[in-house]
A protein has these predicted regions:
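Carboxylate-rich, polar loop motifs that coordinate divalent cations or form catalytic acidic clusters
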Residues: 1-517
Length: 517
C-alpha cells in the first residue's frame, strides 16, 4: 500500500507538470472565505497585504484583518475607525495603512493598533469628508487621494502639507489616477481619461490614440495596471483596453464591464468583471473565462461580480466579489489536480479519502469514509460508480489479490470483488473460529508470499485461500490493528492503537513488540 501511495504521488506530480505546457489542461481551484468564516460582510471592495503579511479586506460593513487562520474586524463601534464602508486601502512607507471610506480618510498605526482620522486641512481649507475613490503615492512617497465632489488631494508628509487639485474645476469625480514620473493620469467619471503634469500647472489633456481618437470618452474607468513592453491596461465599463505608451496604439481585449485587474505573471493578466473572472494570456491572446458553475462546486468561484483583485507576496491571488466574499487562489493549488464531489457529475463520491489501491489494468480504486468506493481511470481521468451494491459509505481498507479486490469496511465486514467476473462475496464476524473476529476492518496487506492479513479493531485475521475462510491470530487478540506493512526482508509490521508496533517474522514464526518507554 505504501509503495502504491508513492507511485500515486509521483503520478500526480506528473499530471501537475502537464498543465504548465498545455494551457487547455489548467484547472483553477479556489478557497472561499465569507461571513461563515468570520468575514464581516460579503461585498469586498478593497484588498491589501501589509509588510507583516496580514491581509486586509475592505467591505461595505467593516475592515477585516486576516492572519491566515481568523479574521479580526474593525468597525466604528469597536475602534477609532469612523466609518464602516471601506472604499480604499494603501500602506505608506512607514507601515501605516491609509483607509478610504464613504466619509473621509483614517490612518491605522500597526504599532499602537489604533486609528486616527485624517483631518488635515488643505491649502484651500478643505478637509476630506466625502467618498474616497482611491489612495496611492508617487515616487517621492507623497500620498494622493481622490475624493468625490472634492477633487484630487496630494499630502506631503515631510512637510505636513495637503494640496487640493481640481476642487473648483467643475469636472466630474476622479475615479482612478496614476502617476508616471512627472505626469499624472486621471480618469473622470463617465467623462474621459486625461493627463497633465503632476504639479497641475498645465491644463488637462484628453488621451488620444495613435489615430487621434478619444477612445475613453464617456467611459467609466475602474482600474489600471502597468504591464510589460511599456503597456498600460485599463478596466472600464466598455471593457479591457491595452495602451502601448511607446507607439500610442491601443487594443480592445475584452468587451465586457471590467472592474479589477491584477498581473499574476508578466504575461498573465487576471481580469475581474461583472460576468466572472477572465485570465488573459498576453503571449497568445488566449482567454480563460471562469464563472460560478450551475452545479454545486466547493472549489469554484463564489460569485460572478468581481470587484477587487490582489496578488500576495507568495504569488497567490485574492479575489473580492460583491456577493460571495473572498476567493483565494494559492500558488500550490496549481501544482496538483484536485478531485472532489460535484453534484450532478461523475466525480469522487466522498471527501474523506481513506485508501488507494491499483488493479492489474492500472485503474485506481479509492475508498472514502463518507462516500464509499470509487474507480478512477488515470488515462481518461474519469470516475465510475462502484459495481458492488452496499458499498456506498465507510471504506477503511483496500487490497488487491491478483484480480480480486478486497474491501474492508467500518461495521459492514469484508467484501471480495472479482474484477473479471464481477462476482462478489461478503464476509462477516461469526462465532466460529474460522470467521472474522470483527466487522470493523481497518487495515489489510497482501504479502509477497500471497498471504492476506486483515486487521480489525479487536485483532488480526489471516485469509485462507484454499478453504475460503479465516484464521484468527490470537497473538493480537483485543488489539486495534491500524496499519500493516511488509518490509524488504519479508517481515510483517503491525501498527496498533495504544499497543505499540509488532513485528512478525514468518520464517521462524517469531513476534516482537515495540512500545514507548
Amino acid at each position: 500500500m505504501k509503495r502504491l501511495i508513492i507511485k500515486l504521488f509521483l503520478s500526480l506530480c506528473l499530471w501537475a507538470v502537464l498543465p504548465v505546457c498545455a494551457q487547455d489542461a489548467v484547472h483553477y481551484y479556489f478557497r472561499t472565505m465569507d461571513i461563515r468564516n468570520g468575514l464581516s460582510q460579503n461585498t469586498v471592495y478593497q484588498i491589501l497585504q501589509d509588510r507583516k503579511g496580514f491581509m486586509w479586506f475592505g467591505t461595505k460593513d467593516g475592515l477585516n484583518r486576516y492572519d491566515g487562520l481568523s479574521f479580526r474586524i474593525y468597525k466604528k463601534e469597536n475602534s477609532g475607525l469612523g466609518k464602516n464602508f471601506i472604499t480604499a486601502l494603501y500602506e505608506d512607507r512607514r507601515g501605516n495603512i491609509w483607509i478610504g471610506t464613504d466619509g473621509g480618510v483614517f490612518i491605522y498605526d500597526p504599532v499602537l493598533d489604533s486609528f486616527t482620522a485624517f483631518d488635515e486641512a488643505s491649502d484651500n481649507g478643505s478637509i476630506i469628508r466625502d467618498f474616497v475613490t482611491m489612495i496611492g503615492s508617487d515616487e517621492d512617497d507623497n500620498i494622493w487621494i481622490s475624493v468625490e465632489n472634492q477633487g484630487l488631494f496630494c499630502y506631503k508628509p515631510d512637510e505636513g502639507r495637503l494640496l487640493n487639485h481640481l476642487h473648483d474645476s467643475g469636472l466630474p469625480n476622479v475615479t482612478r489616477f496614476w502617476l508616471n514620473g512627472n505626469t499624472c493620469w486621471l480618469a473622470l467619471y463617465a467623462d474621459n481619461l486625461y493627463y497633465t503634469k503632476a504639479d497641475f500647472e498645465t491644463p488637462l489633456q484628453p488621451f488620444k490614440d495613435a489615430e487621434g481618437n478619444e477612445i475613453f470618452k464617456n467611459d467609466i474607468i475602474n482600474w489600471q495596471v502597468s504591464g510589460p513592453h511599456n503597456c498600460v491596461y485599463i478596466a472600464s465599463l466598455n471593457g479591457l483596453t491595452e495602451i502601448n505608451q511607446t507607439t500610442g496604439k491601443t487594443r480592445k481585449l475584452l468587451n465586457t464591464y471590467v472592474r479589477a485587474l491584477q498581473f499574476k505573471s508578466d504575461n498573465e493578466l487576471w481580469v475581474g468583471a461583472e460576468s466572472g473572472l477572465y485570465i488573459y494570456n498576453l503571449t497568445n491572446d488566449k482567454i480563460t473565462h471562469l464563472t460560478v458553475p450551475d452545479q454545486d462546486d466547493s472549489y469554484a468561484l463564489s460569485d460572478n461580480a468581481i470587484y477587487s483583485l490582489y496578488k500576495d507576496a507568495e504569488g497567490g491571488i485574492w479575489i473580492g466579489s460583491y456577493f460571495g466574499g473572498i476567493d483565494y487562489y494559492p500558488t500550490q493549488y496549481a501544482t496538483f489536480e484536485k478531485y472532489y464531489p460535484i453534484i450532478g457529475q461523475n466525480s469522487l463520491s466522498g471527501k474523506v479519502v481513506r485508501e488507494f489501491c491499483e488493479d492489474e489494468d492500472g485503474n485506481l480504486w479509492i475508498g472514502t469514509e463518507d462516500g464509499g468506493l470509487n474507480k478512477f481511470n488515470p488515462k481518461t481521468k474519469e470516475f465510475s460508480p462502484c459495481p458492488l451494491a452496499g458499498l456506498h459509505y465507510n471504506v477503511h481498507a483496500l487490497s488487491m489479490d491478483n484480480h480480486t479486490l478486497w474491501i474492508g469496511t467500518y461495521s459492514k465486514g469484508l467484501y471480495s470483488l472479482d474484477l473479471k467476473t464481477r462476482r462478489s462475496r461478503h464476509y462477516l464476524m461469526g462465532h466460529a473460529e474460522n470467521t472474522l473476529n470483527d466487522n470493523n476492518i481497518y487495515s489489510m496487506c497482501r504479502t509477497s508470499a500471497g498471504q492476506l492479513y486483515i486487521g480489525t479493531t479487536t485483532g488480526l485475521n489471516l485469509y485462507n485461500h484454499e478453504t475460503n475462510d479465516f484464521t484468527r491470530i490470537h497473538k493480537m487478540d483485543g488489539i486495534f490493528v491500524f496499519n500493516i506493512l511488509e518490509d524488504s526482508k519479508g517481515n510483517i509490521w503491525f501498527a496498533t492503537y495504544n499497543s505499540g508496533i509488532f513485528k512478525y517474522n514468518p520464517r521462524n514464526n517469531s513476534w516482537k513488540n515495540y512500545v514507548s518507554t
